[in-house]
Amino acid sequence: DAVVSRGLGDVYKRQDHSGVASGFVHIFNHALIKGGLFMAVGYFAILYKDRVTLNSLKGFGYKYPITSFALLICGLSLIGLPLTNGFISKLYLFQALYTNQMYLSIALVAVSSALAVVYFWKIVEQMWFSEIKFKSEKEDTYIYLPIWIVTISIIVFGIYSTPIIEFSNLSADYLISGYQN
């Protein structure tokens, strides 16, 4: 996020439309992704009745499969898997950075994506590949339903991103050229 913020600050100073628009796309998409992740982990904290640590997630993929699968989709979106809004974010960020010849920023975004793969894999490993395999427990619909609304939005905006992109382009126009009546 810090890398993206720095890059966006640079493109804003240059008043580059593609950079500002990609920043808006990223802010929207990233908010959905992180919102879904935090909601899922928050639900695990309620179920676990304690602070959630990496070790406490052992077997949760089997114990709470509905919420765990939502967390998996959100995490894959954070990494930038195609058909998720995270992929759209990364695609537009890379295009804007390349257009502005910001090759160091491209490398930093690529490294941060690789790090996301590493740390998210540790979560997946604990949830599904640890020795502990629980029997599935009933999950509260009123809690996992909002998590899944966000998760489905992540997929929908990954497949049909036109409204977000158009709104981001319009917002970039207004920000760069100023609102004219």
Locations of regions flagged by a protein language model:
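Single conserved hydrophobic/aromatic residue that forms the stacking wall/gate
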Residues: 1-12
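Helix-coil boundary and interhelical linker segments in multi-pass alpha-helical membrane proteins
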Residues: 10-26, 96-104
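Predominantly late transmembrane helices and immediately cytosolic-facing juxtamembrane segments
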Residues: 34-38, 104-138
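Hydrophobic alpha-helical transmembrane segments of multi-pass membrane proteins
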Residues: 24, 28-32, 41, 107-115, ...
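Helical transmembrane-bundle signal
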Residues: 10, 71, 75, 113-119, ...
